Each structure stands twice: as C-alpha cells, then as structure tokens.
C-alpha cells in the first residue's frame, strides 16, 4: 500500500512540474499585450466599437501589431473588413488603418486554425513606433454594411516588441 501511495505522490509531483514548465514556456518575453474581447452570440452590433487599453512600458521602440479573429461556421462572408486606430500619451488619434481579413477561400473553406465550428486567424497590421510609454487606446470596428454581424466569436489584439 505504501508503494502505491508513493507512486501517487510521484505522479502528482510530475504533473505539477509539467504544469509549471508549460506555464514558463508559454510566457513570451516579446509579447507586451495579448487579449481578446468576446462578441455577443447574437452578433456584433455596428455601434459596438471594441476598446483595448494597452499599457506600453517602453518608449522609442517599434512594436508589431496583430489582430486575431475567431469566427464560427455561421459567419456569412469570405472576408471581414476592420478599421483599427489608436491614440496615446503623445498623440491624438492617428488615422485608422483598414484590414481586409480573408477568413475563407473561394471554395468556402475556413483558413484559420480550429475545429468544431470555431476558427482563429491572425493578421499582421505592421509595425508602429511608440515614442512615449503609457496607456494607449486601440479601437477596432467592422466596416461592413450589416447592422448586426453574425458569426464572429472574439476579436483580439497582440502587441509584441
């Protein structure tokens, strides 16, 4: 009975060690900010601009900005057009960038990673230069004519050094 208990303790220690190792490996020293905002199940309303408050610790640095889209099978289009802008301590709202994200190919096959009806795609916006540390507000809105846009599950942004 003692050897069985000892083995369980060993398994538990091994599981804890693997968990800690995976957390350490998963941490990316280059990622400054990475989060998603959920979209209601009924759809994304035209007037609902997504806001992301990003604390940027380093100034005089170029950052890579990416947008991540999680869509469901019921998204009715091949593409999603987004307007992305940001403002911060040293700037008043820069002109918006427009992203035309291709979510499905011409045959209707979803291009993102995923399964079970949920797919995630990542799109690079490019590099932005931050000249002053502080809090920056990133705004994301869709530019399609629909008043309610179904089939989008989450929108995320990622800022990397």
Language-model regions: role of each:
Residues 60-63, 124, 131-142:
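Short tyrosine-centred short linear motifs in exposed loops/low-complexity segments
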Residues 68-71, 139-146:
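Short beta-strand-plus-loop segments that form exposed binding edges in beta-rich domains
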Residues 2-15:
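Bacterial N-terminal signal peptides that target proteins for export
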Residues 48-77:
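Post-signal-peptide N-terminal segment of Sec-exported extracytoplasmic proteins
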Residues 28-31:
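Bacterial signal peptide processing site
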Residues 99-129:
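An anionic, turn-rich surface loop/hairpin at beta-sheet edges
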Residues 76-82, 151-153:
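Short coil-to-beta strand junction motifs in C2/discoidin
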Residues 23-26:
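C-terminal motif of bacterial Sec signal peptides marking the signal peptidase cleavage site
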């Amino acid at each position: 009975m003692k050897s069985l208990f000892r083995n369980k303790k060993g398994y538990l220690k091994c599981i804890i060690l693997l968990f800690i190792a995976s957390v350490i490996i998963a941490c990316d020293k280059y990622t400054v900010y990475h989060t998603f905002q959920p979209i209601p199940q009924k759809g994304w309303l035209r007037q609902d601009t997504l806001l992301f408050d990003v604390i940027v610790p380093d100034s005089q640095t170029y950052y890579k900005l990416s947008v991540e889209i999680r869509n469901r099978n019921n998204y009715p289009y091949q593409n999603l057009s987004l307007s992305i802008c940001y403002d911060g301590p040293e700037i008043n709202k820069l002109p918006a960038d427009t992203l035309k994200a291709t979510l499905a190919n011409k045959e209707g096959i979803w291009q993102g990673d995923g399964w079970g009806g949920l797919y995630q795609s990542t799109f690079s916006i490019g590099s932005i230069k931050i000249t002053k540390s502080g809090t920056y507000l990133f705004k994301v809105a869709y530019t399609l004519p629909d008043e309610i846009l179904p089939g989008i599950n989450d929108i995320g942004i990622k800022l990397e050094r």
